[in-house]
């Protein structure tokens, strides 16, 4: 039971500190905007400095003046938007059997020529030993947490591409929308055999999308990334070739690069972009992308009216002017139709989500079926207590 008086005191303290942080961030933002325009005026020298620098941060790669903006292109009258999302019932040793369920939903929205929509969700139950465990760096480990999340991501992508390819056969332009990053950063630091297994299937989806001319959009709402700000931090360093393993300013109270530390790209581009406009396409230096080949992921920031979002897309789409314009126009249009968030993704989420009551019903069904077959099944006292709490 919460002590609301104590909580209120802590909230008041938090709000006071947040106000002070906001004032500090405003100063950092002003400096970052100034630096952005300065480096844009000499952007080729800036690119050279970034190439010579060595940092421990993700630093955006730049191909043109970083303050360049692009106006909203016209969306094709005939276009199909496909989205996928998923949710899961996690495995639990407190339940009657070790099993997990993945529910993958797809949404297909046709615009123009009468429109139309198709919604589907497909539950998949995993219970065999080969489902619940995998070989991971020479060990056999249980599929749970991030490992389960990655499996779900691959299933979402497979369903997304399958539906997008089917829609492409109609002849209209097609965009495939995914909620979140296209960069599988979760694979960094994982065993090589596991990386290879996950990337093989993932990149096969991207390759199929490429062959069909279907751009995949990774839509990130309220992004916390700092790739572009980190590039500006390198620009603030007086050194010609900054090496942050041997920084001559690390003992300073406030090193030059720390002047805009903590600022997000979202705040930076909120001061630059107008509604409908996007930034240039930046490159990511995430190490896992070295394994992506022709599908290396780039990103741009887009002002959708209510917020700045990060849009990720494969290199083959970002270097194709027609596909890049299609991604720009569709991402913005979807956000408008969804009152700030893509309507296709919102619908896919609604189709995919497994609610608490459904989870309990799922395990009740499992228990009932096993008991019908004469099995002796038992939920742990802990879980039984949670389900039927009394005082």
Residue ranges and their predicted role:
Residues 89-139:
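Acidic, metal-ligating active-site segments
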Residues 81-84:
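Short hydrophobic beta-strand that contains or immediately precedes a catalytic carboxylate
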Residues 1-69, 73-74, 145-174, 180-391:
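Long, contiguous domain-sized segments
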């Amino acid at each position: 039971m919460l002590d609301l008086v104590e909580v209120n005191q802590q909230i008041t303290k938090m709000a006071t500190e947040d106000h002070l942080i906001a004032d500090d961030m405003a100063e950092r933002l002003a400096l970052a905007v100034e630096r952005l325009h300065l480096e844009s005026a000499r952007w080729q020298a800036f690119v050279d400095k970034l190439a010579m620098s060595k940092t421990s941060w993700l630093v955006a790669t730049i191909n043109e003046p970083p303050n360049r903006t692009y106006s909203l292109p016209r969306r094709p009258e005939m276009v199909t938007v496909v989205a996928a999302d998923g949710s899961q019932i996690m495995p639990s040793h407190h339940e009657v059997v070790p099993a997990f369920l993945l529910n993958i939903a797809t949404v297909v929205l046709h615009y123009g020529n009468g429109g139309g929509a198709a919604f589907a969700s497909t539950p998949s139950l995993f219970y065999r030993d080969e489902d619940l465990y995998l070989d991971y760096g020479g060990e056999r480990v249980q599929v749970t947490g991030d490992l389960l999340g990655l499996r779900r991501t691959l299933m979402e992508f497979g369903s997304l591409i399958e539906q997008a390819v089917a829609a492409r056969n109609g002849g209209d332009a097609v965009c495939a929308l995914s909620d979140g990053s296209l960069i599988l950063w979760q694979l960094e630091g994982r065993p090589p055999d596991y990386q290879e297994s996950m990337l093989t299937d993932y990149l096969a989806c991207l390759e199929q999308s490429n062959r069909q001319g279907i751009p995949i959009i990774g839509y990130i709402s309220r992004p916390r990334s700092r790739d572009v700000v980190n590039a500006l931090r390198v620009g603030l360093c007086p050194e010609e070739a900054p090496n942050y393993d041997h920084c001559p300013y690390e003992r300073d109270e406030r090193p030059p690069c720390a002047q805009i530390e903590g600022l997000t790209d979202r705040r930076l581009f909120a001061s630059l972009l107008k509604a409908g406009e996007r930034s240039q396409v930046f490159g990511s230096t995430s190490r896992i992308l070295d394994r992506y080949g022709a599908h290396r992921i780039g990103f741009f920031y887009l002002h959708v009216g209510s917020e700045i979002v990060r849009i990720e897309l494969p290199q083959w789409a970002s270097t194709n002017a027609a596909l890049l314009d299609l991604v720009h126009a569709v991402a913005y249009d979807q956000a408008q139709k969804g009152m700030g968030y893509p309507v296709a993704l919102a619908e896919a989420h609604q189709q995919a989500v497994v609610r608490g009551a459904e989870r309990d019903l799922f395990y009740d069904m499992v228990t009932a079926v096993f008991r019908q077959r004469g099995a002796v099944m038992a939920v742990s006292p802990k879980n039984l207590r949670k389900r039927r709490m009394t005082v």
